[in-house]
Amino acid sequence: MKRRDALKNIGFAAGFAIITPSIFSMLQGCTGDSVTWIPNYLTSDEKIFVTNLADIMIPKTATTPSATEVNVPQFIDKYIDEVLDTNDQEITRAAFVKVIAILRPDATADLVDATTEQYKALLDDHMLLKGEIDPERTADPEAMLMTTSEFLNQLKWMIINAYKNSEEVGENILAYDPVPAAYYCGDLQELTGGKSYSL
């Protein structure tokens, strides 16, 4: 991968990583039912894709809410719409088109009908681990667009970070210290029951 491409991809991820008060307020401002919300950037198919993918990656358990219950898809839509520049939005849109075409080879089929197994197969086949060779990137190292694997990994990273930084998860699931003034030296298991601290 060329340095320029690596820097471009790092820039996309770094924009999300630098959590500023405006990003936090954007995350906290994402409210509403995941079924009835109207996205600002995402198309209806992209909304379905992000919503299903988020719940497959972070499903509801007995002790934790699912990604859609803490409005992760709404945050991703708002982040792409308000933070990414026009060029990055176009690159993201092209990546969505490509990945949805893989998930739904028949363009006339309804994406709502895609099963959890189809999503999992997409992830198994196309979301490569660090160090694995990306055949799309190898075939065209000069391409300015994200490969399917790069896009799925960036979406995964965004889903996890939006989930961890949501108010519900930060205050009620992770160890929460609203005024972290004291210094604690000890075993994490002993101090927080094994939970990491929220931001």
Which sequence ranges carry the predicted segments?
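C-terminal segment of N-terminal export signals and the immediately downstream linker at the start
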Residues: 1, 5, 21-56
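N-terminal secretory signal peptides and thylakoid transit peptides that target proteins
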Residues: 1-17
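Short, contiguous, pocket-lining structural segments
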Residues: 15, 41-45, 68
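Short amphipathic alpha-helical interaction/hinge segments
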Residues: 18-22, 134
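A short N-terminal beta->alpha junction/helix N-cap motif
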Residues: 37-41, 59-67, 84-87
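Post-signal-peptide N-terminal segment of Sec-exported extracytoplasmic proteins
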Residues: 46-78
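Mature-region segments of soluble proteins
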Residues: 64, 71-199
